[in-house]
Amino acid sequence: MSNSTQHWIAQRGTALQGSLTIPGDKSVSHRAVMFAALADGTSKIDGFLEGEDTRSTAAIFAQLGVRIETPSASQRIVHGVGVDGLQPPQGPLDCGNAGTGMRLLAGVLAAQRFDSVLVGDASLSKRPMRRVTDPLAQMGARIETESDGTPPLRVHGGQALQGITFASPVASAQVKSAVLLAGLYATGETSVSEPHPTRDYTERMLSAFGVEIAFSPGQARLRGGQRLRATDIAVPADFSSAAFFIVAASIIPGSDVTLRAVGLNPRRTGLLAALRLMGADIVEDNHAEHGGEPVADLRVRYAPLRGAQIPEALVPDMIDEFPALFVAAAAARGDTVVSGAAELRVKESDRLAAMATGLRALGIVVDEKPDGATIHGGTLGSGVIESHGDHRIAMAFAIAGQLSTGTVQVNDVANVATSFPGFDSLAQGAGFGLSARP
């Protein structure tokens, strides 16, 4: 079954059982191919996510003159050209749906000697980019956006960049990463501070590639002029993808699943803390480290959940997992309150509105507010859901269908392939009632 089908029909299946291997982490895969391309020497990447977003990033570096081999779907061998070895592209660089790819590439391309244009699909073309282009402009970059600050990004090369001390107004790992990557090319030191700590994939991986970088929660700094050394990277399983099965096993009676070698970056796992507040039964085992990233097996067993107030401090550490959390909240006894999550309105869709509207269509009472919502737990009924082409909305309602009193039709599911190719077949094998329709 292909994720490119038009819609899914989700309905009650069986309890989830057994051991599951989740595809590689999207955030780590993006950075691995990017940093390997900028390194001196050849790097091997194992566990690479073969999704549309990550393929877009790899294809862009091929357009920039980097040779990338594909021995298997989950492997890449990248022949790095060094920080100063990228070549002018022959046309626009298409990021597809990948906000990570576009924002991080803006930081790299701002320092090149040539001009370039970054474009994206209809969803990415609506997303805010001034949060990246403004600090890059402070460093001396010249990047043009549309009048409303959206893509395409027209990057003018040949600019001399200066290091800056940047206090980011938003808690965004993508913004931080773009500034740090530009900082590699800048004169002097570049430092970034954040209102709340965000994921530190960039900092950890730059360190793995030999860059001297100082970082702690909410702070990072590096000096310009450094080079990257090739290294091999083992990409852990993607926590954001695992999140859908973590929630499903938590709310489907009788479930007991183990998810293998899941990335547990401490700035990524807010969902685990939130679900544990709600009474979830989640046990970590076999802790290890892959490419600077902590990993572990997660055993998740069904447990009756109760509503909870989600601490705002957890929000940056679970920003991509809120669609799954909303489904857990709908299945819980009592009310779950989410605040401080306005960033959800500028993701691949307005996720607050999309989840609130979808849950209401299934009979759940949701009080929406500008930066969050209160979800009143209840019984999930039948309905038709518009995913708005957002992969995480689509997968969240595939879970909701597992507790539905009838069927849930989830429309516009093609973009699931951007982050989780094979989601539907893996879900079916685990026990989901899920079928594809044209």
From Swiss-Prot:
**What EC number(s) would the UniProt record show?**
2.5.1.19
Q: Name one GO biological process term.
A: amino acid biosynthetic process
Q: Name one GO molecular function term.
A: 3-phosphoshikimate 1-carboxyvinyltransferase activity
Task: Report the superkingdom from the record.
Answer: Bacteria
Q: Which residues form the active site?
A: D320 (proton acceptor)
Q: What does this protein do?
A: Catalyzes the transfer of the enolpyruvyl moiety of phosphoenolpyruvate (PEP) to the 5-hydroxyl of shikimate-3-phosphate (S3P) to produce enolpyruvyl shikimate-3-phosphate and inorganic phosphate.
Subunit structure, as described in the record: Monomer.
Q: What is this protein called?
A: 3-phosphoshikimate 1-carboxyvinyltransferase
Q: Where does this protein come from, organism-wise?
A: Xanthomonas campestris pv. campestris (strain B100)
